[in-house]
Amino acid sequence: SIKELKKIDKKEVRMPQLEQELRGSDEIIGLGEDTTYITKGTIINGNIETDGDIEILGRVDGNVRCAGKLIISGRINGDIDTTDLYAEAANITGEIRASGTVKIGTGSVTVGNITAFTASIAGAVKGDVDIADAVVIDSTAVVVGNIKSRDVQVNSGAIIEGFCKQVHSDVDVDQFFKNGIESLE
């Protein structure tokens, strides 16, 4: 019927909008022509290595090396080396190393250390987080581990069980205390 066709048309028009909201960013929509897709229900037993992008909706039991963007809504049991990583409702067990950005979205759980240039964490992380530049710990985040960065932003509601240290900062904090309390008078 015409009523049913209108419902289908509305769903088709709304899907790109929903997909963009789910991913939370315009920057991850631009996957290249050389993208590898691991569909939901697919299980890969072994390592994956590609010069392109990867989108994982299924499960990978092995290490993943990706020269491009890695988008995960599935599960990875293994170490990850990539340029940028975007995890939304993902489960990751293993080390994450990214030369660019790591975004751990709400509903994602990662067990393993994270090393990247920048990061945004809204999910759960059990492991140390070492970020060369800025890290944002969102209000929905749970981090069990130490955080090292240049800049850190912790939003109200975030849970951190560990230490935060700005080791990559250019500020010499010892300089503020070199003359003791007398320098404040």
State each model region's role.
Residues 1-47, 101, 106-109, 115, ...:
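Intrinsically disordered, low-complexity terminal regions
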Residues 35-87:
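Short, highly charged
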Residues 71, 75-79, 83, 87-95, ...:
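Alpha-helical adaptor scaffolds
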